């Protein structure tokens, strides 16, 4: 038995084996992204919403004004798309800032599909 194993290990490299080894990279799955949404209410001043969009989302005045109008007319608008951690932070910042200024502004996040 020992002899058979030894003979198998001495096989010549040119034995007709045509298998090819290929290195495959494991596919890294991208982390899911989350939409940050601003919701309309009847009490938060439009100017405050524009200020929030400029301050926490880095939008210029014209961009912030457009999104504020969308929120006002449609009831909701996507403000941005971020990783989970960043989206969560932005929602918390907006909600905290609105509460400190006694506005009922709502900001939420949802997984992008």
Curated annotation (Swiss-Prot):
For biological process, the GO terms are: protein catabolic process; proteolysis
Q: Disordered: where is this region?
A: 1-25
Q: What are the Basic and acidic residues biased-composition ranges? A: 1-11
Q: Which InterPro entries match?
A: ClpS (IPR022935), ClpS_core (IPR003769), Ribosomal_bL12_C/ClpS-like (IPR014719)
The entry describes its oligomerization and partners as:
Binds to the N-terminal domain of the chaperone ClpA.
Per the entry, what this protein does is: Involved in the modulation of the specificity of the ClpAP-mediated ATP-dependent protein degradation.
Protein family membership: Belongs to the ClpS family.
> What is this protein called in UniProt?
ATP-dependent Clp protease adapter protein ClpS
């Amino acid at each position: 038995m020992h002899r058979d194993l030894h003979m198998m290990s001495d096989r010549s490299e040119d034995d007709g084996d045509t298998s090819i080894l290929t290195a495959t990279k494991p596919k890294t799955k991208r982390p899911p992204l989350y939409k940050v949404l601003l919701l309309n209410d009847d009490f938060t001043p439009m100017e405050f919403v524009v200020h929030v969009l400029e301050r926490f989302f880095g939008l210029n005045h014209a961009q912030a004004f457009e999104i504020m109008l969308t929120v006002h007319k449609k009831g909701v608008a996507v403000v941005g798309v971020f990783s989970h951690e960043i989206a969560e932070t932005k929602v918390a910042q907006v909600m905290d800032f609105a509460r400190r200024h006694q506005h009922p502004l709502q900001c939420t996040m949802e997984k992008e599909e």
